[in-house]
């Protein structure tokens, strides 16, 4: 994929769309500026009231209040605080397959169980925090809805807005798919897009890439069962802590010698618990390992080989291992054409110098991967570092000191609106 930064840095009026027989109007930068203050107010209310998990009643109400009065179809989730909003276009046009196209835009809404230490005057005080910037995702999606609503009469198809709880470890995307979000407009959506803000990346710069974008996440839980005894007489027992400690090193050594660095496997022993007293060798120890992979081949190999390695190593020391291996999330894979479209649209709106092709995938994981497994689309990042904050003082997402600027909200909303509107224009011509 050629980088937009290699092209002419001039960009077009935000309302223009590629030539089409349809009279399509999309929002302008002036339209986005008109709603900017309201977006900042909403973002700060969401931030101050951060909630965790699948049940986000305050967040859901703030969104509903923000979109009240719009000519839209709203469906609340069953058992989770999701919202699915459908905006019907006024020039709904069947494509070559006889289907009125629909495009999905997604914004996740949940926070993290992190006590906030940003110093913001709108900081949350509940022990929960929007440390990953999902308050901006939610607000940007509300902004895109409001902008497209103004121009709904010219849209040649429908837009589905996916307000998702439970991204942070609750598989909210999977649950919304089970409840039918991909088919909310009637026929299945033809494309899906999402963006994630980054507190440590330059304000107003977008990042994307073709193909593998974020890692798959698997979890391996290990119980090493030994034989407890007095700490002064280890030979009369079987020490699970010593064997567990050996596993930590052996797992890393195995990965570095058996897996290709150009199709990487990254593992981390994030939990290691065993024992209740310093003078007792316990009966068991427990380890939990996170496993990150970028390809189906390595994901499958890791699932087959790592539990076998653990079982054999533990048995060699005369102990037993119980291993539970769970695939939690698939990799986030961008469609090549949609990744190109993502960056081309951003470059056209804001200049090619602000649209960057990521050279490598991101080792974190994301449940929007569930959507991209079923629908072609693209996921990217958007920098929201505080203006004039030195790079060395920027804290990354998930830090209690991660400070996300809301100065890019209008651009974020405009970009999402154009992703949907321009994609509908293309689909209507196919």
Residue ranges and their predicted role:
Residues 2-4, 18-21, 242-430:
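Metal-dependent amide/peptide-bond hydrolase catalytic core
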Residues 4-13, 18-130, 135, 139-155:
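Acidic/His- and Gly-rich active-site-bordering loop/insert found
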Residues 46, 85, 105, 134, ...:
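Divalent metal-coordination and catalytic microenvironments
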Residues 71, 188-190, 376:
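Conserved acidic residues
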Residues 92-93, 112-129, 135-136, 148, ...:
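Histidine/acidic-residue-rich, glycine-tolerant segments that coordinate divalent metal ions
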Residues 104-106, 196, 220-222, 379-385:
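Non-cysteine beta-strand/loop elements that form the S-adenosyl-L-methionine
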């Amino acid at each position: 994929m050629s980088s937009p930064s290699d092209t002419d840095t001039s960009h077009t009026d935000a309302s223009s769309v590629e030539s089409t027989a349809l009279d399509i109007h999309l929002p302008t930068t002036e339209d986005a500026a008109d709603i900017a203050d309201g977006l900042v107010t909403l973002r700060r209310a969401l931030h101050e009231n951060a909630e965790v998990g699948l049940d986000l009643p305050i967040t859901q109400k703030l969104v509903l209040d923000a979109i009240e009065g719009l000519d839209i179809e709203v469906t609340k989730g069953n058992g989770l605080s999701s919202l699915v909003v459908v905006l019907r276009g006024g020039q709904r046009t069947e494509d070559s397959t006889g289907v009125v196209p629909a495009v999905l835009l997604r914004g996740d809404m949940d926070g993290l169980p992190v006590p906030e230490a940003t110093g913001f005057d709108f900081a949350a005080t509940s022990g929960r925090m929007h440390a990953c910037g999902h308050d901006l995702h939610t607000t940007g999606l509300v902004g895109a809805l409001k902008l497209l609503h103004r121009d709904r009469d010219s849209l040649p198809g429908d837009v589905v807005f996916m307000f998702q709880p439970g991204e942070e470890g609750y598989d909210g995307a999977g649950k919304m798919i089970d409840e039918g979000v991909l088919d909310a407009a009637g026929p299945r959506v033809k494309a899906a897009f999402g963006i994630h803000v980054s507190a440590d990346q330059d304000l107003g710069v977008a990042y994307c890439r073709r193909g593998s974008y974020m890692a798959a996440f698997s979890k391996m839980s290990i119980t090493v069962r030994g034989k407890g005894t007095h700490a002064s007489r280890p030979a009369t027992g079987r020490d699970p802590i010593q064997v567990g400690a050996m596993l930590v090193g052996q797992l890393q050594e195995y990965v570095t010698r058996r897996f290709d660095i150009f199709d990487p496997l990254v593992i981390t022993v994030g939990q290691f618990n065993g024992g209740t007293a310093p003078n007792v060798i316990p009966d068991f120890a427990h380890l939990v390992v996170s496993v990150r992979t970028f390809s189906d081949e390595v994901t499958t190999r890791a699932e087959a080989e790592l539990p076998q390695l653990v079982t054999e190593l533990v048995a060699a020391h005369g102990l037993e291992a119980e291993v539970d291996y769970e695939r939690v999330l698939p990799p986030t894979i961008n469609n090549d054409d949609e990744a190109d479209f993502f960056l081309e649209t951003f470059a056209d709106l804001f200049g090619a110098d602000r649209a960057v092709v990521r050279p490598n995938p991101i080792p974190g994981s994301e449940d929007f991967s569930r959507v991209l497994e079923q629908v072609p689309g693209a996921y990217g990042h958007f920098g929201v570092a505080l203006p004039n904050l030195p790079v060395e003082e920027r804290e990354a997402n998930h830090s209690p000191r991660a400070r996300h600027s809301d100065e890019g909200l209008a651009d974020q909303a405009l970009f999402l609106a154009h992703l949907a509107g321009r994609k509908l224009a293309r689909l209507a011509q196919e």
